[in-house]
Amino acid sequence: MASAADDSALGGQEERESFTIYHEGRELQLHWRGLPPLQRFPASRICSNAGGELLLLTTDHALYSAKLQANREHMDLQLLRTDVVDMDFCSGSQELFVVLTNGSVQRQATGSGRDVGHPHAWQTLGFDPLELHAEGVRIRRVCCSAQGVVFVGASGETYVMGSCGEVFKAEQQPRHMRLYEEGKELLDLAAGNEHFVMLVAPYNLADDALQLSVASAKEEPEDERASVKSISSGHSERSVAANTRHLLHQGYALLHTQLFTFGASNNGLLGSGDHIRRANVMRLQKLDSMGVCSIAAGLEHTVARTLDGRLYHWGLNNHSQLGEDVSSPMEITITENTAALPIEQNSALEATCGDYHTLLLNASGQIHSLQPAPPMRHLQQSSTYAQTLLQLQLGAAWPRQLRLLMCSGGYTLQNQRQFQRQYHYYLSHLQSQLQLLLKHRQAVQTLEIWQRQSALEPLSALGPLLINWERILCLLVATLHSLEGFYRADFVQPADLLFICHYKEYIDLFDGYTKAYCDVFSVNGFGEAVVAITGLSSPLAELNEESYVTRLFQQPFSIYQLFVQFMELLVRTQSEYGEHRVAWSEFARHSCISQELAVNTKDFWSSNDRNPRIVQFRGRHRRVILTSALVPLKLVTSGISRSSNSFILFSDFLCQVSGNSLYSYPLTTLWVWTEGDSLRLTTPEKSFLVSTRSQEMRKVWLDQLQSSIIASLGKPLGSPVPSYRSTGYEFSREHPKFSRVKACGTWRKGVLHGNCYLEYPDGSVYCGELQHGIIEGFGKMVIPTTGLYVGNFKGGRFHGHGVYEMHCKDSPESEVYEGNFCEGLFHGHGVMRNNRYIYVGEYQANARSGYGVIEDLVSGDKYMGMFADNKRSGIGSCITNRGDYFEGSFSGDDLTGSGVAVFENDYYYEGELTLLGPNGRGEYYMPSGDACGGSGAMGTGEFDDTCELIGNKMFGQLSGTWDTVRIQAGELVLNRRFPKYPSSLGRQVVDHNRKWRSLFNNFESDLANCTASTSSSGGNQSAGTLRKSSKPTLSTAQIWNCIAVYMSKQRAREGTKPGNYFNNILLSLPLPQKTSSPLAKARTTTSALSKLQTEAASALDFLGFPPRRIQSQEALNSKPGGLQRADSLISMGHNTSRDLDNSSLASFQLDQSLMNSTVNGDESSTFNESFSKLSHNNNNSISKHMNNIDCSITSTTSTTSAVLDQVPSFGMALVLTEQDVTSIRLYLEQAFKDRHHPLYVLNERIANCFHYSYGYWKVKPTPILAKQAMREWESISRRIYRFVRKMFPALPEELCQMEGSREVISHITLLYPLVLSEGIYSTLFVLYANKYSRKDEMYRQNLNLAEKLKDQELVELMGHESFLHNVMLDPKFVESVQTLKELQEKFSPQDMLTVIQRSTQLLTEAYEHAMAANAAQLNADNMIPLTMLTMLRAAVPHLGAELALLDDLTGGPNFQAEMNGMAGYCYTTLKAAYEHVTSRALQKIP
């Protein structure tokens, strides 16, 4: 279809036709009957019936009937229908078949003088009478012989009708019949009187033949099975790899086309070379893989054309159409005098067949008749179309090119085109290149067979080159197909040419071929292959000549030169293709340089073939760039050198030959710069000076070294040599720090600096940061027989916050420590978990020392107090698994001296005691009831701590056990009154401000050091020693600077995926090409590290890493040197043991390619194969510990707000304003939710401590802890607030009341709504619920009864006024009940008070609405009864504990304004209602 641009190009000459029709050699004038088409479309098919009428189908699906007028100079065209995609005429049955746009087929008989196209004469054919296809059968093509018809479906399936010899007979209706093999695509179909010819191409068979990797589903979103489809880049979003694959698939399919024939008789019509009749379809093997691109058939002969311009014909010569009978395809020429004609007239662009003649369209646009009949003879000299004809862009018609020449009966039709004749030179020369490659393809295929079957190394080395040669051949075929379409004007934009729109893919393929060729040529591979061939029986004598084999593989280099010339011509008129021209020119230059280097390298190896020390470096992938023999270079030494030094610059390393020693320095880890008149060369293990004789020579060496380094790093030529690089290296055995360590990471002038990956000879692995060659910063270390550490390092040792998972082969226990380290030891706040206990608290030099909480997982006992030297020492409290509570002074892990003991049955003791029983003077109280009478108070957890009990008392010298207390010297008195709890209770517990001191100190120290670590050098070890250090004092500006650096580091560690920091490090590491071994035994050599595959990162996922089997804490303490040596990389696991437990080895998962790859070019130096996938579970896993939401104050995470990305300006002045308070609250709300912010981290750590202290109860906790937990939480909140004040100095030190409002600002009002999360509140609530269980049990029983009663019954049972029932029916009352239910979902005091106040307000509105008729106001007499009813309907669980906890949270001056106002009144009313409800048990009235 012509585009709008084409219309404008017509320039008002719309009467111009897009095709010309000839009859018996004369051009006819076309007359359009009726309204002629506004836009002329080319013809796609013509056929003539028996009456001499011509049927013409155009590309716009219009079918015309054309009749020759009597004067034989004019032809009338009449439109029949506009929905036809294909048509053909069967001369035997006199029927016209048309394929419609909807895929259906209709036929019409045209004999007996009937007019073609009568609307009522069409008959629709059925292809699926049984309706087996859900969507029906869609036909796209029809082809007719004299008696038979073949239909082709949209999916390539074929149907037959009529008769064709023994193949199919007398089919009255279409029948499905497979005419060609499965897995092939039908490209074209032609028919004579008694035979059919099919052109087919294979589907994607190129994957195996060309060794192509199968593209992923993402790269191929659409079905591309049809291998010859267009892949124009203008309509493709595939990746480069996918485009390359499709290019080669298209070329492979076009090259490996096949011809199939079948017919009623043979007589040479089938091209089989004989006259034997065939009862089935036959393949013409002679034309296999010849690149046949089009076919045409006359009544008794057939013509085929190939992409390289060759023609073949066969058939009968009854009418002199062939010159002689030809029963097998024979190549023909256009003219006998080819040399005298221009080259455009010497190549056939298209061939077609009339009934008994063959017409050719040459590249000049001239029609030639091949031995034409006399009436057509003058066409041989004429019919060259004008250059001003309409240009057409067919779009969907390409690449199945529209036929430019068609014949039927005595008519010939030529679709007019304006050929791109200025580019014919390139078309013809590419055809010549294809002919040459096809001519020598047998030799290549012979080498391929030998290469696969022979074990000879010279032949095996040809494998990559042979594959690349086949790829270039397929690429050339696809290129010719594209260029021919452009030349014929099937498309007119040069951007649609494959070698332009896919120039990157083309250059990659040619670059691959160039490399494969140079790899073979540089090591004399062709000569060695010829020598190997001489021992084989070669069917081709030329393969015994090295010159022939070399020329054979040099031939493809002529192809891209034509592309360069084409681009040079193109940019003269269309400068927008300058980028493509530059790309092709640069590639041509680089290819020439590569070939020149290959020649030089071959000469170098030839001249040194008797030097074994040099020959060992000989490899296909290595080139010789420069030698000191060519350009002198010598080593600068301080003394007199006794041996001479020579240098050889290879493409991947610099070789130094010194006497009997030989050294190699990989270019990826080589730094070079000018130093005076010399050159300074620096490697990870050595730095030395070299000099030249002149400045020019020094520049040559400097330029070659720098360009070689750039090339080895994979950077574009001309890039500056980077001082920072990401590459790999294996240190030699002599290196003092990293002996035999394989390192891959960021380097700066020979020193590791940045993110790195280290693998040690004993299997230890480190992944993380290094500073100036020292492990310092954040990282992960896996140590066989010792454990796994993730955290901060300093000076090569654990330092700062980290997680250390220890394991031991001989111990079944597991142990994980998370906390602070100092100089490789547990020091500061930490959490130790193993199978026997959990400890949370302070450490000093690997020992528990200071305040801590330890829970015995075996016995269930919990201790909260002071430690010294791993033992309980100092004041503390112990809670047993029975719920007994001990408080006093501990020494040597036992309770000694005076203390108190409160037992689960409400007995208690004051005096000298141990954990086992009384031990000296003391008093033992045994209550039997409360002072009010009855024993109901026993064990109920009465909420009134001052309640007095009645019971017996023992005092004096007491002994025995707690089960049997004995009086040694004392008295037993009966029925005495005494308080419920000991008077000295709580006097010997650790001060709440002393608890978790190290946690806050470590937090502030880590925050202060995060900026110091970025600016300090690797050798600075002054900070962080085991000596007690002063608490860092930072100004407000310094704190904000530390917060910014901290958040930046946290985000960098997390990367794009949470917990994937180490994966991102490995993904950022280089993947250089694998190199062969230059020195397999000399460990002083170094070269490029082999590929580090990204699959290794899967084992570095910190959050998903399970713990290992480890040694106990006691075993660790028995070996203090294990974490205290000067270099933790040596101390942690670098032992001599080789008997490692692979099942529990903490290691990295590396794939097989990494295991087998080389380091420093040593093929025997592979990565440790013991690195296997870690996949066993443990209850103490790090992942569970890090993601324990129960321990989290703020379990929700959110994206970083813009508020956190800048230093705030509010809260910094001396005066605090309401706007400051609002902004501070907004900032803190975001900070406590953002996992990158230090406040979030502080929250997480302190929440863990609080939960370990007052959570994890296996039995009902003692109510004594309720008040202690509340006071401890207040202390924690106050210390968090103290740090927040450093961020916002305007905040008050204690509290203040805002001017103009009653709002109080303090740590409670500011932080409780943010940090008092579900986890903390739930922990406190459990303690309070146990303490206030008596009233809540009564409350629960009354709720159960009230739930069963109707509203009226409940009012009567409670003894309230009956009119309150009307209030309960009001919707506001129901809303009040629902609001009060929200109390159990709130955690902060302010939110809880708001819920209570809102519920009371709705209750008031319900009363006023219900009593509106009486205009009654709600008073105190009715408020409490209504509140009781609301409470019983809301049924908030453990309401007594909720109210008591709220009472403690709102105590003090912080909520004085609220408690003195409406919120306090509502709270007091609810509390009073609760007391009324629980004062007695409700009983249903009978």
UniProtKB/Swiss-Prot annotation:
GO biological process terms, semicolon-separated: early endosome to late endosome transport; endosomal transport; melanotic encapsulation of foreign target; regulation of Rab protein signal transduction
This protein's UniProt keywords: GTPase activation, Guanine-nucleotide releasing factor, Repeat
InterPro entries referenced in this protein's UniProt entry, alphabetically: Alsin_GEFs/MotNeuronReg, MORN, RCC1/BLIP-II, Reg_chr_condens, VPS9, VPS9_dom_sf
Signal peptide boundaries: none
Primary role: Has guanine nucleotide exchange factor (GEF) activity towards Rab5. Promotes the exchange of GDP to GTP, converting inactive GDP-bound Rab5 into its active GTP-bound form.
Record flagged with keyword DNA repair: no
Keyword Repeat carried by entry: yes
Record's protein name: Alsin homolog
Organism field: Drosophila melanogaster (Fruit fly)
Gene disruption: observed consequences: Deterioration of locomotion in adults with climbing ability strongly depressed.
Single GO MF annotation: small GTPase binding
PANTHER family: ALSIN HOMOLOG (PTHR46089:SF2)
PROSITE patterns, per the entry: RCC1_2, RCC1_3, VPS9
RCC1 repeats: 147-201, 256-307, 308-363
Stretches assigned to the VPS9 domain: 1333-1486
Repeat region (MORN), residues: 744-765, 766-784, 789-804, 817-832, 839-853, 863-884
Tissue-wise expression: In the embryo, expressed in a wide range of tissues including the epidermis and the ventral nerve cord.
Pfam (any one): MORN
GO cellular component: cytoplasm; intracellular membrane-bounded organelle; vesicle
Gene3D superfamilies: Histone H3 K4-specific methyltransferase SET7/9 N-terminal domain, Regulator of chromosome condensation 1/beta-lactamase-inhibitor protein II, VPS9 domain
Effect listed in the UniProt record for changing L1439A: Reduced GEF activity
Top-level taxon of the source organism: Eukaryota
